[in-house]
């Protein structure tokens, strides 16, 4: 089980920083044996062990180092809140975080997430990749371009949306909303194989 936060989880802590709030949830979730990510990456290695690469590590490592870390990964999950820095209609100015963060901080957090995402895109191709965010891609990415064969899972809008043509996969179709009493789980399929030579160019070695 992998958890991320949404804007509602920030409401009750107006005097705390995002890092403080994140750590409150992280401690509770991880104490109970589950996974939590905020601007971080989880990957399942060839031995089915769950590994995490922290935000500072993602920023520190170059692409070659990250590729080496993920070379034998069967599944990659990158994500976090995402934030709504690129949404001019529904953002911090409309109170979606209440008093916890303002529009300026929201934009900076969006940029922070987008920088990590852009850095990861070329590294995590062909890795059975899930991009797990609360906000949809258009809110946290300047370019609304979905990567081929990535699975994008998000919520926030309270409007269900599903698209899957086996190349582009966007799953925002299990949003509960405010008054839905019919809560259920959904699932999707990912291959569990990995290609250790995916970063090699065609040729003889």
Positions of PLM-derived features:
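Secondary-structure boundary motif
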Residues: 30, 122-126, 147
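Short catalytic/ligand-binding loop motif for oxyanion handling, primarily in non-cytosolic enzymes
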Residues: 11-13, 44-47, 85-88, 139-140, ...
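Active-site-proximal loop/helix segment associated with metal-binding centers of metalloenzymes
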Residues: 48-130
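Conserved beta-sheet core of the metallophosphoesterase superfamily
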Residues: 2-4, 31-32, 74, 136-205
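Short beta-strand segments
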Residues: 132-134
């Amino acid at each position: 089980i992998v958890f991320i936060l949404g804007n509602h989880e920030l409401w009750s802590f107006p005097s705390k920083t995002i890092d403080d709030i994140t750590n409150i949830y992280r401690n509770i979730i991880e104490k109970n044996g589950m996974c939590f990510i905020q601007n971080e990456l989880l990957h399942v290695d060839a031995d089915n062990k769950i590994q995490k690469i922290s935000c500072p590590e993602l920023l520190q490592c170059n692409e070659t180092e990250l590729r080496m870390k993920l070379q034998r990964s069967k599944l990659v999950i990158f994500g976090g809140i995402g934030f709504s820095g690129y949404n001019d209609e529904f953002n911090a100015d409309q109170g979606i975080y209440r008093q916890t963060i303002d529009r300026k901080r929201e934009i900076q957090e969006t940029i922070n997430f987008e920088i990590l995402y852009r850095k990861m895109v070329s590294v995590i191709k062909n890795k059975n990749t899930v991009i797990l965010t609360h906000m949809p891609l258009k809110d946290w990415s300047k370019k609304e371009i979905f990567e081929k064969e990535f699975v994008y899972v998000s919520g926030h809008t309270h409007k269900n949306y599903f698209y899957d043509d086996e190349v582009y996969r966007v799953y925002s179709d299990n949003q509960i909303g405010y008054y839905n009493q019919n809560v259920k789980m959904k699932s999707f399929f990912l291959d569990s194989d990995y290609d250790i030579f995916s970063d090699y160019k065609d040729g003889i070695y």
